[in-house]
């Protein structure tokens, strides 16, 4: 329970008035619980979307659902997406890329990445004809994001500062990664049947390509690239689901 509370405090803005000593927790092994943080985020997103959808048109409800995640996470990973885009597409050397990612200012690449991310994300949601299914997507996709993050933890080389937040998860063993993937697959299977499982295969393929690209650019992961990977992973999952629903 302490591990889950610590993960909630780490990845969300939920005010839990509990002080936990990091020395008492093996966060690397406890990272298997990370998808359950996605469950909490997803439940919040689903609730906000569902309530707004009762009163407002569907596009407004979708925007509310997207904004709900920013509220509960503080835009933690959206900021990481912007920093990653600014750094990796800066056409600079490795050291300079890492410096750019640390910069609190958002550059042109970051703004473009965020704009296209939400435009594409919102368009994909609008492509789903069933309102109830959109609600389930708001619930499940944050779980997928945490599954992708766990995949990126596997045998991770850390490129950022050793004092960086992502370094806490350096050396995560394989078994928490596997457990996290099982949780994600169960969630996708329960809500979207075999199509959800097939869609996650596309997410895994994306994760492999993304990981290789990041390692080639900066030699490993850091907090920003980990957060960006999770954000893009849930976008890719939604894309694969919409594509499969259109084909089948």
UniProtKB/Swiss-Prot annotation:
It is found in: Cell membrane. Belongs to the CobS family. Pfam families: CobS. It comes from the Bacteria. Its main location: membrane. GO terms for biological process: cobalamin biosynthetic process. This is Adenosylcobinamide-GDP ribazoletransferase. Pathway: Cofactor biosynthesis; adenosylcobalamin biosynthesis; adenosylcobalamin from cob(II)yrinate a,c-diamide: step 7/7. Its cofactor is Mg(2+). InterPro entries: CobS. Keywords: Cell membrane, Cobalamin biosynthesis, Magnesium, Membrane, Transferase, Transmembrane, Transmembrane helix. It is an enzyme of class 2 (transferase). It catalyses: alpha-ribazole + adenosylcob(III)inamide-GDP = adenosylcob(III)alamin + GMP + H(+); alpha-ribazole 5'-phosphate + adenosylcob(III)inamide-GDP = adenosylcob(III)alamin 5'-phosphate + GMP + H(+). Joins adenosylcobinamide-GDP and alpha-ribazole to generate adenosylcobalamin (Ado-cobalamin). Also synthesizes adenosylcobalamin 5'-phosphate from adenosylcobinamide-GDP and alpha-ribazole 5'-phosphate. It comes from Listeria monocytogenes serotype 4b (strain CLIP80459). GO terms for molecular function: adenosylcobinamide-GDP ribazoletransferase activity; cobalamin 5'-phosphate synthase activity. Its EC number is 2.7.8.26. The chain crosses the membrane at residues 24-44, 70-90, 106-126, 134-154, 157-177, 188-210, 228-248. The lineage of its organism: Bacteria, Bacillati, Bacillota, Bacilli, Bacillales. One of its GO terms (cellular component) is plasma membrane. It is a multi-pass membrane protein.
